[in-house]
Structure formats: structure tokens, C-alpha cells
A protein has these predicted regions:
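Structural signature of tandem alpha-helical TPR/SEL1-like repeats
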Residues: 59-69, 94-107, 128-141, 163-175, ...
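N-terminal leader/linker segments that initiate helical-solenoid repeat arrays
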Residues: 20-83
Length: 237
């Protein structure tokens, strides 16, 4: 993981690249209809990312880089707009900058209303960093505010699993699935629980279900192949 950087530094650096083309200066710009502005940037960015973002040509940045810079600029102009902060947090996390993502998510979660999607990603980062007490506390607090959010229960299950509480993790996965979490993902998590419990046959059954539900999800396939090899099962061609 890359070291954390202050939020102001991260956003200022992104905006500085295009400062010469900004008119009027960002400090004098007003936040106007941020939902529409964000949508006009996110939609083409997601479309380009689905195809694969190409590199820039010479000194020119790529279109993906330009759109990301504009999303970062919007966070400076509209610093209290939670969806824009969330978009920048996701971009930072995907770019392997968890420190920047964490600071953006903390800004969102400091606002008075509930933002479960922000809590899910913040909890995931805490789990990855080994801060299980914080992750559990955050997720439990957010579940009280948004008890019908599948992602909160699923991420809470992950925190419980990593902490060795397999029974409660399974219960949380049952809730997450009932609230709409994808079955293939639930099957993968259940496979982890069965594997940790020493029930390899059950784990392989769940991993097989996860692979069938989402063949592109590599962790399920990798664990299934490893368990089959350990059991002496020849891999399928």
C-alpha cells in the first residue's frame, strides 16, 4: 500500500494539472448542481474504464485522467457534496491510495446523515489494515442507522470472519443475502467459513457455486483449484 497523504494535498495536486485551463479560478467558483456535474463526469469515465483506459499521448493526459481530474476538482468546488467525495474515494482506493480514500470517507461519515456505502468501503479499508475493532464498531453503528443495507451486513460478516467469529459471520451473511447481496458473493464467503472450519467438501461446493455465478471472480476459482489439488482431484481441462 502507498503511504497516506493529506486530502488537501491529493486534491490540490489533481487540480494543479489543469489550473491554467480553469476559468474562473477554483477559489471563486460556486458549487452549482453538483449531482448533474458529477453524473456528466462519472458516466463517460465508467464507460471508458469498462473498455480499458488508454495512456495519454506525449505530454497530453488520457481522457480517463482528465475525467478523474475533473471529479477531483468538483470535490474542491463542492467540498460537502457526499456523492462527489465518494466518487473520489473510490477512485483513490482503486488507485491503491487507501490513505486518501480513508480521509475522503471520514469526511462523508462526519456528516449528520447515514452514508452506508461510504461505511462499507471505510470498513473494508479498516479490515485490510487489520483494524478490526474500528471496523466492527463502525459497521455496527451504521447497521443501527441503515439495518436494511446488504453491503453493511456483508462487510460486517467479513470483519467477524477475519476475527474468528465464524458463527456470527454466517448469520450476517444470511441477512445480507436476504437483503439482496449477490448469491455468488455470499457463496464465496460461505466457502471461506467452511474452509476455516475444516469442511473442505462444503467449501468446494460453495466455491463451485461462486465460480458458476461469476466466472470472472478469480479468488473463488483459485481457492477451488487449491482445495481440489489438496484433495487429489485432477483439475478440469
Amino acid at each position: 500500500m502507498m503511504p497516506s497523504r493529506r486530502l488537501s494535498t491529493a486534491l490540490a495536486a489533481a487540480v494543479f494539472v489543469g489550473a491554467c485551463a480553469s476559468a474562473p479560478p477554483i477559489a471563486r467558483q460556486q458549487c452549482y448542481n453538483p449531482d448533474a456535474q458529477l453524473a456528466s463526469l462519472l458516466q463517460p469515465l465508467e464507460s471508458l474504464q469498462a473498455k480499458g483506459c488508454g495512456p495519454g499521448v506525449g505530454a497530453r493526459e488520457s481522457e480517463c485522467e482528465r475525467l478523474r481530474r475533473e471529479i477531483a476538482r468538483l470535490a474542491v468546488v463542492c467540498p460537502a457534496h457526499a456523492p462527489t467525495l465518494m466518487a473520489n474515494a473510490v477512485i483513490a482506493y482503486d488507485d491503491k491510495r487507501p490513505g486518501d480514500a480513508q480521509q475522503l470517507l471520514d469526511l462523508i461519515l462526519s456528516q449528520p446523515r447515514s452514508y452506508p456505502d461510504a461505511a462499507v468501503l471505510r470498513g473494508q479499508i479498516a479490515i485490510e489494515e487489520g483494524n478490526l475493532p474500528f471496523a466492527r464498531r463502525l459497521l455496527e453503528d451504521q447497521i443501527r442507522l441503515a439495518p436494511d443495507h446488504a453491503g453493511l451486513h456483508e462487510t460486517h460478516a467479513a470483519a467477524l470472519y477475519v476475527g474468528g467469529n465464524l458463527v456470527d459471520a454466517r448469520d450476517e451473511l444470511t441477512l445480507a443475502e436476504a437483503l439482496g447481496a449477490p448469491r455468488w458473493r455470499i457463496a464465496y464467503h460461505l466457502g471461506l467459513i467452511e474452509e476455516a472450519s475444516g469442511r473442505r467438501d462444503e467449501a468446494m461446493r460453495y466455491y463451485t457455486e461462486a465460480v458458476a455465478g461469476n466466472p470472472a471472480f478469480q479468488p473463488a476459482g483459485a481457492r477451488l483449484r487449491a482445495l481440489r489439488a489438496a484433495s487429489g482431484v485432477r483439475p478440469t481441462p
